[in-house]
A protein has these predicted regions:
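Flexible, glycine/charged-enriched surface loops at secondary-structure junctions
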Residues: 139-145, 211, 246-254, 321-324, ...
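Residues forming the flavin
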Residues: 24-41, 158-162
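Short alpha-helical segments in extracytoplasmic peptidoglycan/chitin-binding modules
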Residues: 1, 26, 232, 237-241, ...
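Active-site gating/interface segments in enzymes
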Residues: 172-174, 240, 244-293
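Ferredoxin-type iron-sulfur electron-transfer modules in oxidoreductases and energy-metabolism complexes
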Residues: 277-288, 298, 302-375
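Acidic low-complexity segments
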Residues: 32-93, 112
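Hydrophobic alpha-helical positions that pack around
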Residues: 50, 65, 75-82, 90-95, ...
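N-terminal, Lys/Arg-enriched amphipathic/low-complexity engagement segments
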Residues: 2-27, 32
């Protein structure tokens, strides 16, 4: 493991010190290579499963002369990557001097193609959404970003989509993290491809966002597919339509790397940020192995943190050290858990640590305030 002697001395001397592995950060940002398993969903087209009451719902209170950002707000469009309202992202891009609009259709997680499939099948709407975003923020140009590694998929992607240049991103997973500095230097703003499609529909068809694009996949269903579904659909309803197996042992909603396990399929509904629903037959055991200190989790962290020490500090409840080790910078990609030979739940423990650190800091602040009042 890395030598901490100088850093610990700095800490004991009362200095604030960052424990990120800057010497290894470039290596870490290369990411890890994952099997994609995007077929047959990616090449199978998009199936539409919508409730009658949520199909083509008109935008409330739409006024003649509303600008693009206002329409995005009234349409309730949510960016599928960030979970934030699209109008806020557009407004921020407009105020920051954005020069380039980027349509994110990366889909770098295994099984998931719920951004790429709409980008390929609904290219006209995507391009229209890109042009609207450019107009809204005053950008000069635009491009789309698509993951280079598509595994065994027969889908071919040209140099442009409807005239918009395509940048094939070749970094490992998580690919988006490797692009942050590049986007910052270019003054580029990134928007989810699906959000841009919904923007085109809102402006041209005057309809609100009531649907989301989702990939249903895994060996626990008869076939995988990309869907456009209304936001009132449950995970169980969608999985059963595609042959949910009785042997399914685990269902994950979100993504294969960043998703969360769910148990109540019929009460878990899709949201505007749901990217996939995966059903797996594999039996996931809690082996309770002991960490062997190999450091593989540190090697792959895309933001240069030390999952090894963060995991140890969470287990020990050492909250002050969690802050010193920049736990708040964790992006939740799950690569640390993926490479762990002991099958430890490193990523989920770090997520728990982030939440407990907030509670710890709030309690500490409240205690200090009470002491000041008594003084």
């Amino acid at each position: 493991m890395p030598d901490f002697s100088n850093r610990l001395l700095a800490r004991f001397a009362g200095q604030r010190f960052s424990y990120r592995w800057y010497s290894d950060i470039q290596l870490a940002r290369q990411g890890i290579v994952l099997e994609q398993n995007k077929e047959p969903a990616l090449s199978g087209g998009i199936q539409r499963i919508c409730s009658r009451t949520l199909d083509h719902v008109p935008i409330d209170d739409l006024q003649e002369g509303d600008d693009i950002v206002t329409i995005a707000r009234k349409a309730g469009i949510i960016d599928e990557n960030t979970g934030r309202p699209l109008y806020l992202l557009l407004d921020r891009a407009r105020n920051s001097g954005c020069r380039i609009i980027i349509a994110d259709a990366l889909d770098d997680e295994p099984y998931i193609s719920s951004q790429l499939a709409p980008a390929l099948e609904m290219t006209d709407q995507l391009v229209r959404g890109i042009e609207l975003a450019k107009e809204a923020v005053g950008a000069e140009s635009a491009r789309s970003e698509i993951y280079k590694e598509l595994g065994d998929s027969p889908v071919t992607i040209g140099e442009n989509l409807g005239g918009v240049p395509v940048d094939r991103v070749g970094a490992g997973y998580p690919a988006d993290n490797s692009l942050i500095q590049k986007h910052r230097e270019e003054k580029a703003s990134v928007f989810g491809a699906c959000a841009l499609i919904h923007l085109a529909r809102a402006v041209d068809e005057k309809i609100a966002q009531t649907t989301v694009f989702v990939t249903v996949a895994g060996d626990g269903v008869t076939t995988s597919a990309n869907l456009e579904v209304s936001i009132d659909k449950t995970a169980g309803e969608l999985l059963r339509q595609f042959g949910l197996s009785d042997e399914t042992s685990r269902v994950v909603i979100g993504g294969s790397m960043r998703g969360v396990t769910i148990t109540d399929l019929d009460s878990t509904r899709v949201t505007a940020q749901t990217r996939g629903i995966l059903a797996m037959r594999e039996v996931f055991k809690d082996y309770n192995y002991t960490c062997i200190g190999c450091g593989k989790c540190d090697d792959v962290c895309p933001v240069g943190l030390s999952p090894y020490y963060l995991y140890k500090f969470v287990q020990a409840g050492r909250y002050s050290m969690l802050e010193d080790f920049d736990i708040d910078l964790c992006i939740g990609c799950g690569t640390c858990s993926y490479v762990c030979p002991a099958k430890l739940k490193i990523a989920s423990e770090i997520t728990r640590g982030k939440m407990e650190l907030v509670q710890y800091m709030n309690a500490k602040k409240e205690k200090e305030q009470n002491e000041e009042v008594r003084a």
